[in-house]
């Protein structure tokens, strides 16, 4: 009898590495995995409305914790980490040292993802709050100018086969985009002229990714969740630039 595919919902930033991990898991166990990717907050809303996810890998811990608090999902486990980087156009002369000046420059278009819908947007606003501790008035300026270009329910989708952030930057929608370092690395591979700038320590924001399994899901759900914490999957995540839990 053919096993039903395991329904795994995962943050968009996990697309490449989860596709690889799922393929390996299927080859090893025979368990088919159906992957659904998107902004974590939007996925959480879809799950709350009754979609059939059995494993949820979020780019934060708050969204899976909300599901757990409602009772139908297990408390989340942090399974991997990420951090914010600045993805910039070739002509932007940004360095870690002058990044805040660059972000505050009125002539620089600053792109982010959408807070609440996508944790990447929430992390950008956390960076803005840190900027306020470095320079008075920075939060208000950044909050006012930031363009929420991705991750929302109505955000334009890139053409098939294109990465969201590389496409947004190639279209010239932003001069600087605050996104996960893993996304920035992938975007640079797609559009080599783009530059990746590390965020200085005073502004750095870490992202803890939470993993949860639906209560009553088949045993294969817990098996896959445990596999994500095991050395082979952790090595794959590290290859894509993610940090250890």
Region locations from a protein language model:
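Periplasmic N-terminal soluble interaction domains immediately after the signal peptide in Gram-negative
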Residues: 74-75
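Exported/periplasmic ABC-transporter solute-binding proteins
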Residues: 1-36, 40-51, 58-61, 65-69, ...
């Amino acid at each position: 009898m053919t096993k039903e595919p395991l329904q795994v919902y995962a943050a968009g930033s996990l697309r490449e590495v989860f596709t690889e991990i799922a393929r390996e898991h299927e080859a090893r166990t025979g368990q088919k995995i159906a992957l659904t990717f998107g902004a974590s907050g939007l996925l959480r809303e879809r799950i709350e409305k009754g979609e059939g996810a059995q494993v949820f890998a979020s780019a934060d811990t708050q969204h899976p914790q909300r599901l757990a608090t409602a009772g139908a999902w297990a408390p989340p486990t942090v399974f991997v980490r990420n951090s914010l980087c600045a993805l910039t156009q070739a002509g932007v002369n940004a360095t870690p040292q002058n990044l805040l000046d660059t972000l505050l420059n009125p002539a620089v278009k600053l792109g982010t993802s959408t807070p609440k819908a996508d944790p990447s947007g929430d992390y950008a606003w956390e960076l803005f709050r840190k900027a306020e501790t470095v320079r008075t008035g920075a939060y208000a300026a950044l909050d006012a100018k930031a363009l929420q270009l991705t991750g929302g329910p109505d955000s334009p989708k890139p053409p098939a086969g294109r990465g969201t952030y590389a496409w947004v930057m190639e279209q010239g929608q932003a001069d600087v985009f605050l996104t996960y370092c893993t996304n920035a690395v992938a975007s640079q591979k797609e559009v080599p002229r783009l530059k990746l700038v590390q965020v200085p320590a005073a502004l750095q924001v870490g992202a803890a990714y939470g993993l949860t399994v639906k209560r009553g899901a088949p045993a294969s759900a817990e098996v896959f969740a445990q596999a994500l914490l095991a050395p082979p999957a952790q090595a794959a995540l590290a290859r894509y630039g993610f940090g250890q839990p």
